Amino acid sequence: MISVRLKARQLVLSSLTSLSLLAASGSVCSAGDVKAGRAKALMCQACHGLDGLSKTPDAPNIAGQIEPYLVAQLQAFKSGARKNDAMSVVAPSLSDRDIEDLAAYFSAIEINVVKMPGR
């Protein structure tokens, strides 16, 4: 019988290994093309801005977001697993290549996070 302590240690080690592999795969091998993504991002600019900074209160900022996260969210909108009125119109027309390119472009945008005074 494996002790609870040993099981916990195995869980922590496997989690850390998985996270490090995910981080390495996301930062080393980008599947998308940043330049192609910028051209495709023209369709995103009304809500998210060409710079990935939201132009409306209902659209999130996506500049500098982690690439695998953007890919996963666009795929979820495309499949219908995630719902949003605007994205439900746009996402179904995106190819896998479009999704990879858009994610590469928006994740490559450098942002500066500034702490608000008094917070």
Enumerate the predicted regions with their spans:
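Bacterial N-terminal signal peptides that target proteins for export
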Residues: 2-16
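N-terminal signal peptide c-region/cleavage motif recognized by signal peptidases
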Residues: 18, 24-26
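Signal peptide processing junction and immediate N-terminal pro/mature segment
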Residues: 28-30
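Flexible coil segments in periplasmic/lumen-exposed cytochrome c-class electron-transfer proteins
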Residues: 32-41, 50-53, 82-119
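Sequence context surrounding c-type heme c attachment/ligation sites in exported
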Residues: 34-45, 63-72
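A structural feature that tracks compact, well-ordered secondary-structure segments
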Residues: 58-61, 71-78, 88-92
